[in-house]
Structures are given as C-alpha cells and as structure tokens.
C-alpha cells in the first residue's frame, strides 16, 4: 500500500464534520454489490447520501476497465470533480474498482486531486483507508489481499432483490480479458457465511437473491474437502441445495457462468430446486472454434450447444442469455458469420454484445492482426440488429400467457404501471385496470397476462 503525505497543506483541509457522499458505479453486478457495501460503510461512519453529485463532500467512482470506453468515461467524470476540488479543498475524491487496481499509484500522478485509489479487494477496508486520508495522505491500496467477510454494512439499493457475492476473482486466462489481473485469484466464501448473509436478507424481508461471481460455477474449487466420488465437496450445485431451505426467499438466481464448468449436475439441481429461476447467463463469446481457441476459452461450440440442449431438455422454457465479442483480432468475415449463425440457431433470449477492445496486460492486445474500427462498428451494428430480432421473437412466445411477476416498484416512465420480473428475468410492465382498487407491496408476486412483447421487455395486465 502506498501512503503519500501531502506536503502542500493548501491542497488538504481536514473536514471536522462528516458530510454527504455520492457513489457512481460503472460496470458489472459485482461492482454494484461492492458499491452497496462501500455505501454501507460510509453511512456507518456518519456520512449521508447526497442528492447531487456536485454537492457531495465525498465522491467515489467504482470503476470498470473491461473496455476502453468505460475507462474514458471515468476520466471525464474525474476531470469535472478535479476542477471542483480546486474550489473546495476539503472534497474527498476516491476511485475504487478495476481501473483503480489496474492503474494504482499512476492514477494519483495522472489525477493529483485524488485522495484514495483502492482495488476491489479493499472494499471492506474503506473506513481504515479514509482514516489515512484524514491524516493528510494520498493513498493507493492495490496489493492483493484476502477479502474479509464483513458484509454487514451493505446499503442495499433494492429492498426486495439482493446481491450475494459467493466467489471473488478469476483464475481463467482468456487472452482478451483484464479481469484476472485486476480482481485477483479466485476466493470462494464458505457456505455457512453465505447462508448467514442470505438468512439476514430473508429476515429483512428480501424475496430474491442473486449469487454473484466472475466465474460463479467455479465456486468452491479453492475450498477444502473432497467427496467419496472424488469431486470437490463444495460446488455451486452443493451450495444451491444448502441455501434452498432459507425461509422467506422465493427466488434464487446466479451469474455469471463459464461453459467450462457448467455441469449436468448443476442443471439437474436447477430443475429440482423450485426456488432456482429458469434463467441462465452463459457467455459464448464467439461462434467459431478457431476464435474460441485464440481467446483461450477452453471449450468448443459443440460443448456449448450440448449445455443449452441439456438445459432445455429439462426446462424447455428456460431463458438463455449470453455475451459475445465481435471483431476479435484476426476474426475473418466467415468466422464472424459463425457467431451470427450460433445466435440464430440457439435462439438466445438476449445477448450482450461488444466489439473487441484491447486491454492492458492481455496477450490479444499485442497481436498485429487487429480489426479496423470501421469493421468493428459494422459488425457490432449487424449483430445488435440480429439480437434485437431474436429477442423479440423469443418474447413473443409469452403473448397471451400468464406469468408470475415479482413486483419491484412503479414504472418510472408511466405511473399507471407497476414493474417487476418473471422467473425467466423478463422485465415486465403491468397495467392496473382503472376501475380496480389494487393494494400491493414490493415483493408481492402477481399473475400477469402478457399482451405486448418488445425486444427487451413485456407488458401485461393484472389477472384478477
């Protein structure tokens, strides 16, 4: 950990009163969960949540570095706050997350107005790090460390659906991905600690949990214990069985899965356990085996297809979503077309797409056969059009069906509608008949008849 005392005291004025904070989160669900924990820590310290970023006494950016545009957005935000700090020296500026881990001390040099740079493994150490800042130091905390179990202070954004981290880090070495170098090695939490957190959520009237991990189906590989059959004792499958009996929790989800570890046993558990939702997010990244090999993904398209077939053989209406990268270095037009074909053949419910973006400290960034920006834009546009078409077709299967929707709140764009999600994770807007007096609470499950299907959402009417 780097601690640098600020010599120019005009740059630092210790604020004798605890003020307000603002957190902006970039990137994945793991970052969202980390932001909730940091918000809880700040409120425990006495900070209150600001209504306006430009009025906050402490501004924290929880950052992402998976693509270059995410980084540039952070630097844009920092530039605005740096100017503000020159006018208000007591303002505390914090950068957390993957960009902080990647850049470390160099980020303090690039943006000298920063007080604290901290990697993802230091989320639970925020209070101690801010204590060093209060002593007049600039701090960079990016060394790899064991992640503590302190999750008690999380300030949840939802009062119904809760994130639960079960494994941190990633041991894979995909040639395009910076995550292992910024998130560190895999660290699985022990089952009892996970169940205890879920029980607390249930006690607080949460109805749905989402288990999180960069590679969630690799959960337990680093934990001790082996069964008589020779497999690891604590796997994601075992964990699902273990937590299933927590009373009050109605729905269980998990993300993100890696095809390499997605087993028949896991599929069978999802089929047998009625709280586990029929939604599977399994990135395929490319529809071409040669590109998958260059990506170092560790599976073939045939294996990926078998996973989907095994899921649908038990759960025909399961929702399958995925991630895909286009214009990977050296990707030919024919290889790109294989990705389009896979999307059409499988009929994904949704695919999150991105054009390849070179990342620091990754093998693919050094290759000389990079694809032009023009081709990247063309391929991304075409694949997005296909995804929109297939997503709408998949959603049209719901027309005239009755779906159970967990209420999450009102539609912010239409106060006459409430909104929630189906078990298959379809965002659903619900019309309430004007002549009906309908009392509901967040977390209620209601039956909805679907009468409209759009590419990424459904609309229906309350079933009476």
Swiss-Prot record:
Domain TRAM, chain residue ranges per copy: 396-464
Cofactor note: Binds 2 [4Fe-4S] clusters. One cluster is coordinated with 3 cysteines and an exchangeable S-adenosyl-L-methionine.
EC numbers, comma separated: 2.8.4.3
Catalytic class of the enzyme: transferase
Cofactor(s) for this UniProt protein: [4Fe-4S] cluster
Occurrences of domain Radical SAM core (ranges): 156-393
A single GO molecular function term of this UniProt record: 4 iron, 4 sulfur cluster binding
Residue ranges of domain MTTase N-terminal in the record: 19-135
Residues that coordinate or bind [4Fe-4S] cluster 1: 28, 64, 98
Binding site for [4Fe-4S] cluster 2: 170, 174, 177
SUPFAM superfamilies tied to this protein: Radical SAM enzymes (SSF102114)
Catalytic activity: N(6)-dimethylallyladenosine(37) in tRNA + (sulfur carrier)-SH + AH2 + 2 S-adenosyl-L-methionine = 2-methylsulfanyl-N(6)-dimethylallyladenosine(37) in tRNA + (sulfur carrier)-H + 5'-deoxyadenosine + L-methionine + A + S-adenosyl-L-homocysteine + 2 H(+)
Subcellular location: Cytoplasm
GO BP terms, alphabetized: tRNA methylthiolation
CC terms in the record's Gene Ontology section: cytoplasm
SMART domains referenced in this protein's UniProt entry, alphabetically: Elp3 (SM00729)
Keywords noted in UniProt: 4Fe-4S, Cytoplasm, Iron, Iron-sulfur, Metal-binding, S-adenosyl-L-methionine, Transferase, tRNA processing
Family per similarity comment: Belongs to the methylthiotransferase family. MiaB subfamily.
NCBIfam families according to UniProt: miaB-methiolase, MiaB/RimO family radical SAM methylthiotransferase
Protein role: Catalyzes the methylthiolation of N6-(dimethylallyl)adenosine (i(6)A), leading to the formation of 2-methylthio-N6-(dimethylallyl)adenosine (ms(2)i(6)A) at position 37 in tRNAs that read codons beginning with uridine.
Subunit structure: Monomer.
Protein name as catalogued: tRNA-2-methylthio-N(6)-dimethylallyladenosine synthase
Organism, as annotated: Prochlorococcus marinus (strain MIT 9215)
């Amino acid at each position: 950990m780097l601690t640098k005392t600020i010599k120019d005291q005009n740059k630092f004025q210790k604020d004798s009163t605890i003020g307000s904070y603002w957190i902006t989160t970039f990137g994945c669900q793991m970052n969202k969960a980390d932001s909730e924990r940091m918000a809880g820590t700040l409120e425990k310290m006495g900070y209150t949540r600001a209504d306006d970023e430009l009025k906050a006494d402490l501004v924290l950016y929880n950052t992402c570095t998976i693509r270059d545009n995410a980084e540039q957005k952070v630097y844009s935000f920092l530039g605005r706050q740096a100017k503000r700090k020159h006018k208000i020296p007591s303002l505390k500026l914090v950068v957390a997350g993957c960009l902080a881990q990647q850049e470390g001390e160099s980020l303090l040099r690039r943006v000298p107005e920063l007080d604290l740079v901290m990697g993802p493994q230091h989320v639970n150490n925020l209070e101690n790090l801010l204590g060093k800042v209060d002593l007049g130091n600039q701090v960079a905390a990016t060394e790899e460390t064991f992640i503590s179990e302190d999750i008690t202070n999380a300030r949840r954004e939802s009062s119904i659906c809760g994130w639960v981290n079960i494994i941190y880090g990633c041991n894979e070495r995909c040639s395009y991905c910076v995550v292992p170098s910024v998130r560190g090695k895999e660290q699985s939490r022990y089952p009892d600690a996970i169940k205890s957190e879920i029980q607390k959520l249930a006690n607080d009237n949460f109805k749905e949990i989402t288990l999180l991990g960069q590679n969630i189906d690799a959960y337990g590989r680093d934990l001790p214990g082996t069964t008589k059959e020779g497999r690891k004792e604590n796997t994601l499958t075992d964990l699902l069985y273990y937590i299933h009996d927590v009373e009050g929790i109605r729905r269980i989800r998990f993300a993100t899965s890696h095809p390499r570890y997605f087993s028949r046993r896991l599929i069978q558990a999802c089929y047998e356990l009625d709280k586990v939702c029929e939604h599977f997010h399994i990135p395929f990244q490319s529809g071409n085996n040669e590109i998958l090999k260059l990506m170092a993904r560790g599976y073939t398209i045939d294996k990926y297809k078998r996973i989907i077939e095994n899921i649908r053989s038990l759960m025909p209406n399961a929702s399958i979503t995925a991630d895909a990268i286009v214009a990977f270095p050296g990707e030919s037009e024919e290889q790109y077309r294989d990705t389009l074909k896979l999307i059409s053949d499988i009929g994904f419910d949704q695919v999150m797409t991105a054009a390849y973006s070179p990342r620091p400290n990754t093998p693919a960034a050094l290759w000389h056969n990079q694809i032009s920006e023009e081709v990247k834009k063309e391929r991304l546009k075409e694949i997005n059009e296909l995804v929109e078409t297939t997503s709408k077709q998949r959603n049209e299967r719901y027309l005239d069906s009755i779906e159970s929707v967990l209420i999450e709140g009102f539609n912010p764009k239409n106060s006459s509608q409430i909104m929630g999600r189906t078990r298959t994770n379809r965002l659903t807007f619900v019309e309430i008949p004007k002549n009906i007096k309908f009392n509901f609470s967040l977390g209620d499950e209601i039956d909805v008849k679907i009468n409209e299907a759009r590419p990424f959402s459904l609309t229906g009417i309350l079933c009476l």
